[in-house]
């Protein structure tokens, strides 16, 4: 029976991976190509094909302007093809241009002014950014903004924060002179600063204390990203020690825990933070724990023996560790909720989009300065895996993940690599300055180099994703 249940769960996740991946990528590709398409139309460029996917055509229709809208079997991208393109990669067809009549030449992309060609190319990535801003903004408007007090409620022993002199209860006021009013800002700063000294100013019992901390790369396992290394300083905000749910058949469920229970002590030690619970369980070595919970105003003593997980048992964390099978609400102890109007929501959406852009660029820069490894560069397997996991949490999370991917695709396309939009923009910038196009031989050679770079990045992403692929196949067994 357990084997059947596991097979059903794995099959359900596989379907979520496929559905989530197709949902996210199709929308992101459509938005990107629609950006190119709309600006091309505005500039009077004749668009012959708008394709979602590559390869053999599944279905298509032709609109009143003569554009063929097609869907293809390989959903790993898309393209907009202009009248004077030789192929889907927008390589100019010079022979076709020479044979065009005057009407056709008016719609030829390569014959448009350089600023119009640049606008058409830039419109794809910009559409991705705008889409993300609107999606993030819509969620801020819908749910409001939760601000978590930037308090160091829990300090991991031996961490950079502990070494720097952080004390439990320290309230972070600024980092590097930048005011901090939300714990999320601490995380964002730390994640983009591996190996760099950060100057903290904290409030401790009404006194201003200056502390210097250097984030270090720590190996982590989480449900979405799996096993990876992330810069950290070892501080967390307090999370209510309330049981949100229980793992079916887990030690806590067997011991009599119920959703809504508030853990108030473990082995005689007062508990005010879910992080404390996790730490005690993690250090238990599977030994019995005496836990007191508050339920309906009554203190109830419970005894639970943590279960050691087996390698590969948990998709979110393949490392064996003691667990009791309780889920946290994730609700901070110190937080405030702020309602957000539509204009402010768009601003917050733009801020979140900008944070993703700067964080990505910081990560790429840190790879070249040897502060980060390239292990987080992933490909379609990682995107599909994350899409499935977000879909399993809820549709709203999948939509926000789609917005995140939209930012990433937009930014990657702006990298100055020939064959990408950014490479075309570099050629147009040179043309605008010199007054003449870059020689075709140089462009063709650059495109080959660009294609080689893209293929190498894809191979690196595939290599980094082998762990995820192996995990998928292990579930089949």
Where are these predicted regions, by residue range?
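Small-residue-rich helix-interface/hinge motifs
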Residues: 13-98, 412-434
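Alpha-helical transmembrane signal-anchor/signal-peptide segments
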Residues: 43-48, 144-162, 167, 472-476
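Interdomain regulatory linker/hinge segments that flank or connect interaction modules
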Residues: 93-133, 175-225
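Pore domain of cation channels
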Residues: 119-130, 401-414
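PDZ/PDZ-like domain micro-motif
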Residues: 156-170, 187-189, 247-261, 279-280
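Functional transmembrane alpha-helices
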Residues: 2-14, 103-115, 228-265, 269-270, ...
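Internal alpha-helical transmembrane segments
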Residues: 31, 78, 82, 96-154, ...
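Alpha-helical transmembrane segments of integral membrane proteins
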Residues: 16, 20-24, 29, 400, ...
């Amino acid at each position: 029976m357990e084997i059947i249940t596991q097979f059903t769960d794995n099959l359900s996740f596989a379907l979520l991976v496929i559905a989530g991946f197709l949902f996210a990528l199709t929308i992101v590709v459509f938005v990107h190509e629609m950006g190119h398409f709309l600006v091309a139309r505005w500039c009077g460029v004749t668009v012959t094909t708008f394709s979602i996917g590559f390869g053999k055509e599944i279905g298509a229709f032709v609109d009143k302007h003569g554009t063929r809208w097609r869907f293809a079997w390989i959903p790993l991208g898309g393209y907009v093809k202009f009248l004077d393109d030789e192929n889907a990669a927008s390589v100019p067809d010079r022979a076709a241009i020479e044979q065009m009549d005057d009407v056709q030449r008016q719609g030829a992309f390569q014959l448009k002014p350089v600023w119009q060609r640049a606008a058409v190319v830039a419109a794809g990535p910009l559409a991705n950014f705008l889409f993300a801003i609107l999606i993030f903004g819509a969620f801020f408007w819908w749910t409001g903004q939760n601000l978590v007090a930037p308090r160091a409620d829990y300090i991991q022993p031996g961490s950079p924060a502990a070494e720097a002199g952080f004390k439990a209860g320290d309230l972070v006021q600024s980092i590097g002179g930048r005011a901090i009013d939300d714990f999320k800002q601490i995380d964002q700063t730390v994640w983009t600063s591996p190996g760099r000294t950060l100057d903290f100013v904290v409030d401790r019992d009404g006194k201003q204390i200056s502390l210097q901390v250097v984030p270090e790369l720590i190996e982590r396992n989480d449900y979405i990203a799996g096993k990876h290394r992330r810069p950290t300083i070892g501080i967390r905000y307090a999370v209510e020690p309330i049981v949100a749910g229980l793992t079916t058949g887990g030690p806590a469920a067997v011991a009599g825990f119920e959703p809504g229970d508030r853990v108030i002590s473990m082995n005689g030690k007062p508990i005010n933070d879910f992080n404390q619970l996790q730490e005690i369980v993690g250090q238990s070595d599977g030994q019995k724990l005496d836990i007191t919970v508050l339920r309906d105003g009554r203190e109830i003593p419970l005894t639970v023996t943590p279960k050691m997980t087996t390698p590969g048992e948990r998709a979110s964390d393949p490392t064996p560790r003691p667990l009791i099978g309780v889920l946290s609400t994730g609700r901070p102890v110190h937080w405030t909720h702020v309602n957000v109007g539509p204009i402010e929501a768009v601003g917050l959406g733009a801020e979140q989009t900008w944070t993703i852009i700067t964080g990505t660029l910081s990560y790429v820069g840190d790879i070249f300065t040897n502060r980060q490894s390239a292990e987080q560069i992933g490909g379609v397997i990682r995107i599909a895996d994350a899409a499935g996991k977000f879909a399993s949490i809820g549709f709203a999370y999948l939509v926000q993940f789609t917005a995140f991917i939209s930012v990433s695709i937009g930014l990657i396309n702006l990298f100055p690599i020939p064959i990408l939009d950014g490479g075309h923009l570099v050629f147009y910038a040179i043309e605008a300055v010199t007054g003449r196009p870059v020689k075709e031989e140089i462009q063709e050679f650059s495109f080959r180099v660009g294609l080689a770079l893209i293929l190498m990045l894809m191979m690196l992403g595939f290599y980094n994703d082998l762990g995820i692929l192996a995990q998928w196949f292990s579930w089949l067994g």
